[in-house]
Amino acid sequence: IIVIMDKTRKHLISLAVLTAISAIVPTATFAQLHLEIAKAPEQAPKIAIIPFTNDSAIYPIIENDLNRSGRFTSASQNLPATASINQIQAGDWQNAGVPYVVVGQIKNIDANTFEIHYQLYDVQKQQYLLNEVLTVPSSRVRQAGHMISDAIYQALTGIAGDFSGRIAYVLRNPQTPAQRYTLQIADTDGEQPKTVLSSRDPILSPTWTPDAKKIAYVSFETKRPAIYIQDLATGQREVLASFKGLNGAPSFSPDGQSMLFTASMHGNPEIYQMNLNTRQLQRMTNDSAIDTEARYAPDGKSFIFTSDRGGSPQIYRYSFDDSSVKRLTFKGAFNARGTLSA
């Protein structure tokens, strides 16, 4: 049960506690996944993903990825005769109203290696936008499908795709008290889930390191919130922050050398920065307000955070150059959980 208080400051206190230590969430959420909700194009362009020659596994992955993006509509009915590498008749696809076609083929290089040749064809321009070859081990064929989706998405939108990334999330299962909370990682389509940690106690705020080799999270296994970091390859974990009071909302610097987090070791929830090599702490905010949800800017020169220092929860920017703080949001009575794009 999540209780939202009526008064604004109580609401932000609730938010700070939820971000840093909240234990009670109804289902699987809390992923290191940025969700941008926007109006989908009224007529998303059609794209035909033709089954690859000698393979039936990759094209459904690409089709699913592009459909999930909301930027394209999969064309699957009343299509021209099956196209293949270097064999696309532009006129047939123009008549079918399909502006983009993806074809490909897979070849065995040896028992453990595949060569994947794929093409993205622009029907209107009658030219190939992509004509690429990937060589991958057999164990990474599925990952190659996501990589192809990334390339197609960027070629058509100008924006880098992230289908080949991974997501981290927490599952809560009240039916199994011994493993009520499970931290998992998976492909962006939810496939190939892997359990990182199972616990009777709440797990919150999973956060990737920039190199994606480790993940930080908040655990209540000692009956109070603490921030841990875990190596995904070895499973080795260590405590980063277990100070008196709240410890939560970890965020790594772009170079992976520092971490911002919220702590109340001195009574009030403030933002601290930890040097991950020396474990030295630096207090970044110091006032009577609730300061939480710090996130580094992509260039590492500043960070944004949520604070009620102006009377209501709003987003602020802290500059490392001069320690100045600037309010960024003014419209609305509640603005929180900001992130900065590159």
Protein language model regions, located:
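Amphipathic beta-strand/beta-sheet edge segments enriched in Tyr/Trp
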Residues: L33-H34, E63, N86-A151
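Short beta-strand->alpha-helix linker/helix-N-cap micro-motif
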Residues: H34-D92
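A flexible loop/linker signature enriched in serine peptidases of the S9 family
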Residues: A160, R172-Y181, S198-D201, V218-I227, ...
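Short loop/turn segments that connect beta-strands within beta-propeller blades
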Residues: Q124, D187-E191, D231-G235, N275-R279, ...
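A short beta-strand motif characteristic of beta-propeller blades
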Residues: Q192-L197, Q236-A241, Q280-T285, S324-T329
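Hydrophobic beta-strand positions that form the internal "hydrophobic ladder"
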Residues: I167, I215-A216, G256-L260, G300-I304
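Residue-level detector of Asp-centered blade-edge/turn motifs that repeat once per structural unit
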Residues: G161-F163, P210-D211, P254-D255, P298-D299, ...
